[in-house]
Amino acid sequence: MDVGLLEDNPAIQEYLRNALELHGHRVFMHMYGIALLDALFAKKPVYVPLPYDLVIIDLNLPGELSGQDVILRIRKALPPEMLPIIVVSSAAQFQLEQLQSLFPDISFIQKPFKLQTLLQTLEMSNELQR
C-alpha cells in the first residue's frame, strides 16, 4: 500500500517509514500540510489516480495548516472510501474524541502507540476502501 505520512517529527517519520516499509508498504513523507495537499491535488487531471492509498496525519504541525485543516480540505475534496485517513496524535483523549465525532470515518490513534495497533488500523482502513 502507498501511504502518505504527514508528521513533523523527524524521529517519528523515520520510525514509521522503516516499520511500515518492513511490512511491505511504500511511505511518502511530508512535514507540512501544504506539501501533502500538493501531492494529492496539485495540477492533476481528474482521471489521474491519487498517489496514496491512505494517509496518516499528525494533528500538531508547523506552518499555516494544522492537521485538522488538512483533514477538512481532504474531506471536502474526497469521500472516505477514496482516501482513508488515520490520525496519529499526542492530543489529549478528549480532543481526539471530539474530532472523532466530527470525522466518524477517520481512525484515531493516540501517541504513544504500539506498532501493532497502527498496522491493524492500516489493514482495517484498507479493507474498508475495497
Regions found by a protein language model. Give the residues of each.
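Two-component/phosphorelay signaling modules centered on CheY-like receiver
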Residues: 10-35, 103-106
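C-terminal output helix
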Residues: 113-123
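Short amphipathic alpha-helix used as the core "switch/output" element in two-component signaling
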Residues: 66-81
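His-Asp phosphorelay/catalytic-motif detector in bacterial-type signaling
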Residues: 50-53, 78-84
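Conserved acidic carboxylate
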Residues: 7
